[in-house]
């Protein structure tokens, strides 16, 4: 659907070259929700602006449906942009227009007949749950309602792609969840390809099928959501994951390790999370199991669990228990310097 092929964007600033995007190669499949996460200045927003040619790449090509969009004429670009909807952190609504007027605006620009505009806008108002707000102005709406208007406006011309630029960053947690659920509904019912950028890993966790991590203009990690969360390879990705899965060792656990305690990290995935493995080893081996920390989250309908346990007993019995655990779950001894 969308392909970035060795894409770079360089700006000249004060006689120096600034690489906002550097040699990025990515593919976004049709109908998926693809997240791009990174800290401020990572190049996320620049990469998004390249998709609808608000910025042109310095090098490389960008393709949509196997067509190189970097070589399109001005007329062809206008047509392309009708296929791409966009929502923003700051909503970007017209304060002088009603909710109906805001949603109708792109349809008027496209010279859609009035009766069709009315039908389409009413359909979208129902879809986003704002049927009773058609005649309200933006200042009369909450932040979540404004973003719903933004989503409806972005969908007005029936685009194939929806770009989300930090769409939930200005919202409270409860409203963020509501907007993410609405975006999942958009993806599911319209089969829309969604490309979103964020600095919030919990947003990626809730909505994305795949994710790319950017740092200093480069993609440093990319893959399926479950793989990136459960096996992060880079330090930056690990830090993002820890904002959702807190696996830092508490001071009390570190103290136990430093005092000679045998601490192990057990990782469970899928059906493994429901197995009574700790109960089994406690009953069948002469060891005591002390659970120090644990959590379970759901990633794309697959459970992922993380436990820190201390095993106490004779060394021979502990080794037998560990041998059994290795057959059931991923197991790693925690070192004193771990954090």
UniProtKB/Swiss-Prot annotation:
How this chain sits in the membrane, per its record, is: Peripheral membrane protein
The source's superkingdom equals: Bacteria
Q: Which reaction does it catalyse?
A: L-methionine(out) + ATP + H2O = L-methionine(in) + ADP + phosphate + H(+); D-methionine(out) + ATP + H2O = D-methionine(in) + ADP + phosphate + H(+)
Name the InterPro entries for this protein: AAA+_ATPase, ABC_transporter-like_ATP-bd, ABC_transporter-like_CS, ACT-like_dom_sf, MetN_ABC, MetN_ABC_transporter-like, NIL_domain, P-loop_NTPase
One GO cellular component term of this record is: plasma membrane
Q: What is its main location?
A: membrane
**Top enzyme class:** translocase
**Function in brief:** Part of the ABC transporter complex MetNIQ involved in methionine import. Responsible for energy coupling to the transport system.
Q: What is this protein called?
A: Methionine import ATP-binding protein MetN 1
User: From which source organism is this entry?
Assistant: Bacillus thuringiensis subsp. konkukian (strain 97-27)
Originating gene:
metN1
